[in-house]
Amino acid sequence: MKITNDNAATINYWLAIVEPFLTSDEDRNSDDIIRKFRAVVAEHGDTEEVDPEVFFAIFSILATKYGRVYSKKVEELNESLKAAILAGAEAEDLRNKLKDISQRYASQLEITADREQQLESLKKKGHEQPLTGSGSSEPVHAESAHAPQLHVVNDLQQFYIPFNEYPSLTQSIGTSDIANDEHLKRVQLTLKITDTKVFSRTGFEFAISCGSRSTSDKDPYDGIIKISGKSHMRKDIAYAIRTSGITVRQFCAAFANLYWNFNLARNTPPENWRKKGFTEGTKFAAFDFFYAVGSNAAIPTEADGSVRLIRPPTNEENEANSAMRYADIYEQNSKTAGHVTSSPLYNRGSSYESKNKAKLLEM
């Protein structure tokens, strides 16, 4: 039987084949996934050509299904916890259940993200070989052996270093767009917080509050942050940051990896994502220091100094956040550049566009 999109409606059949690839945390090597898929297909008795697009389509459907199930459970437990707290009832059991389901949800998101990356990589390769149960394939015809070859001349070849002579990477990683350790230490000193852990928590709480609001100089930074029995005015923290030689956005960018995982684990996007024009599929990217997510120059998520995101941002999230930042710039400049509208649709390509690119991180 040849499996095509026409008979893929037998969802139970495909569920049995594809679901293990969605839920298993083993074997993240993208080079092995199709081989294992072929083996599973063979176990189900199909030895003829398999349309890979069927696998991709069903996988996407199942990933969405799992996400909705976990999201609903988290939402229900959150509501139950709120009701219990309001009623003054014991809520420790609910908290533990919420923590457990949130961790499982985060793990599922991570597995799904890994699988999506693997499958996307495989799709880009073109799948010149058909997916069959036996793993056999037709030979790919190469171009003529007599085709002219391009010879590349590199003027920097004199500086070539063999791989086995590469120096060990010990220098600090940094970028001007993200606050470094010296910047953070200056802010800590200005705030007179001697305990680094307390300062880290204070900084993270501040970044969380900015994620749902803004890191702009125009923001009033009203509100109070309480850590370890001590209160800090948000405007005082913002002042300490600016007087330390960095912007609030650069400071918050240092916490971008933590903030990203924090929101995904709780399934809670920045509060004002709708107001900023983000969609349901891009709402987690609705904060203005999003550009630092995944950067090794930001605070790591792991104790060994590595960065491990629950899932990486999608292309749609990257594009939506980039569009938001450009829209903010156009709106700001249209007030002084003589434009009758701030819409990027009408103003894009104006003479001041390239100049404004440098201002993306200054807003």
UniProtKB/Swiss-Prot annotation:
Its main location: virion. GO terms for molecular function: structural molecule activity. Keywords: Capsid protein, Coiled coil, Helical capsid protein, Virion. Residues 122-144 are annotated as: Disordered. GO terms for cellular component: helical viral capsid. Residues 72-111 form a coiled coil. Pfam families: Flexi_CP (PF00286). PROSITE patterns: POTEX_CARLAVIRUS_COAT. It is found in: Virion. InterPro entries: Pltvir_coat. This is Capsid protein. It comes from Citrus leaf blotch virus (isolate Nagami kumquat/France/SRA-153/1984) (CLBV).
